[in-house]
Amino acid sequence: MSVKWTSVILLIQLSFYFSSGSCGKVLVWAAEYSHWMNMKTILEELVQRGHEVTVLASSASILFDPNNSSALKIEVFPTSLTKTEFENIIRQQIKRWSELPKDTFWLYFSQMQEIMWKFGDITRNFCKDVVSNKKLMKKLQKSRFDVVFADAIFPCSELLAELLNTPLVYSLRFTPGYNFEKHCGGFLFPPSYVPVVMSELSDHMTFMERVKNMIYMLYFDFCFQIYAMKKWDQFYSEVLGRPTTLSETMGKADIWLIRNSWNFQFPHPLLPNVDFVGGLHCKPAKPLPKEMEEFVQSSGENGVVVFSLGSMVTNMKEERANVIASALAQIPQKVLWRFDGKKPDTLGLNTRLYKWIPQNDLLGHPKTRAFITHGGSNGIYEAIYHGVPMVGIPLFADQPDNIAHMKAKGAAVRLDFDTMSSTDLVNALKTVINDPLYKENVMKLSRIQHDQPVKPLDRAVFWIEFVMRHKGAKHLRPAAHDLTWFQYHSLDVIGFLLACVATVIFIIMKCCLFCFWKFARKGKKGKSD
């Protein structure tokens, strides 16, 4: 066979695998830290499937290097903040959040809201820098993207989608009080059995816990509607040239990909345009580096404990570090501790410090017995995926809530970072390692995580491709978005029906009074005769 005909046959075969019509263009509004890591997993899969992905990132973005030879196209827009300034602000606010006094609800959540508003101001300034950049916006319009993809906790993507007349897909873990989910997405969270995120309650609440949950919900609703959204509403109205709100603009999203799952979250109703894709980043463990593998194998039958408080915790106080190190020195297991700071004086021979650890690969190692975690959702999903019981030491944000969920499901023990003693940590580790119930419970969650008809990552990619193929998914969007709040709750209908009932009762009473008056009059007339 000639070279010419061989080439033709190869091209025909390749045409079955690649089709220019099936490849789309995705515009991404960048996120930071763990939010970006989850999005990146989806984006890399989209690139693998032949789609063109453009990430819109500020010049202050921490995780993006325009010179990095990545398959993702990075479109950098200038902003007034420098990368160092932005990183310092984030670390300061996270440090402040983790140190907030938890004595009273009002004090904790009011100060937490201030931190969220600070982040909101920064994000809004980034958004202004984008939409006011006429050259960049013209370039984006010419690119004719098929979909905008973003983490909903960082607003602006919905404004870009509106300006570019492009469908929108959200990825989201949570927002405080489920504010965006409820008021923008129309999600349903009945407070009678769905605990407000960050309340640390379970779905089986006592009467007083339901009262507490209702107060939390009303507090977050009030702060969101009265204070938090005013600046966004004004900004969006100015840019679009018509009165609008953040809730209205976000409510136009075609699909919400929630990074949650039913083995993690408590059951509650979902809308047709919402799908759970929690644990999409989880994957089988890879072999460990040689030195680390040797250390793990040296643990023998006792196994190892993996310890990480995440990338946001640096320069731990010496007193706390020594308390933890002293506890770890007392257990028979070897410990791999992700730690960036001064070496604790009480560090035992069984513990090794690392500035970075391959967490997923360690959790998937057969010798791993327990995971000490701050309660970040990524780490918890990896522990569930590999079936490793946890000791939770939550610090801020959704971490206390995440650990509360794992504790309610019998897969974790919780400790308080500021008050725990060495004895507390030792006892917690002994409990989750030696009590077989914890292993059984987390293995049950693991089996559920693995037993899905379609993997979370494949579902996430499917919905993005679905939106690109059909130029949106408006057929899944509930009509509730088009109703006012009193129409949504049928208050106008209830008012009308009450008015009808009141009118009927009024007429009946009038008739009765009239009849009574008639009979009374006749009686008097008869007596007089």
Swiss-Prot record:
What GO cellular-component annotations does this UniProt entry give? endoplasmic reticulum membrane
Q: What class of enzyme is it?
A: transferase
- Tell me the leader sequence span: 1-21
UniProt subcellular location:
Microsome membrane; Endoplasmic reticulum membrane
InterPro entries in alphabetical order: UDP-glycosyltransferase (IPR050271), UDP_glucos_trans (IPR002213), UDP_glycos_trans_CS (IPR035595)
- Which UniProt keywords are listed? Endoplasmic reticulum, Glycoprotein, Glycosyltransferase, Membrane, Microsome, Signal, Transferase, Transmembrane, Transmembrane helix
Record protein name field? UDP-glucuronosyltransferase 2B18
Name the source organism: Macaca fascicularis
